[in-house]
Amino acid sequence: MAFNVENFTAIIADKGLSSSNKFEVAIAFPSTGLTSILPETELNLMCDTATIAGKTIQSTPEIHYGVRREVAYNAPTFDPLTLTFYCTEKLAEKKLLDAWQNIIVQHSNPENGNGGNFNVAYYDTYAKSSIITITKLSVSGEPVYKHEYREVYPKTVSAIELSHATSSGPMKVSATFNYIYWKDVTQS
């Protein structure tokens, strides 16, 4: 079937196009006292960009006489989840992400002038109860697609560049989160 402009515009007029700037993020921290630095609702509001992560099916070559094909095997792999946050004046967002990482591997301890002991926390402490939910909203604000990421933790927190040349524009910090899996929790 050849491309038809009238059919295309009819579909757009009927169903509309999705806008990437209509979304909500909800983060449930592990129960480790992080909300004393910044309440979950405030961090959620400061989220500037989010990704709806993808999934890759692992495959391996299957070679039979004459025909070669890739066949699926094993569990899927999931792309990391990246969120970018606006920073408030006192950098509470950066401090919270740093504190969460410090729970995972203690590298700075205010009670010990020599730094942390680099002990790694138990997985259940920093990730087991953590959930990030990203909801894609319609133009009217109705949820149309909802992903829930389970057992999340910040693997990477970006550096923040300071510059005398930049006089406007808000400061931002990005974090890349690892998670065990995601699932579609959209209500039909």
Where are the language model's segments positioned?
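Glycine-rich, low-complexity intrinsically disordered segments
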Residues: 1-188
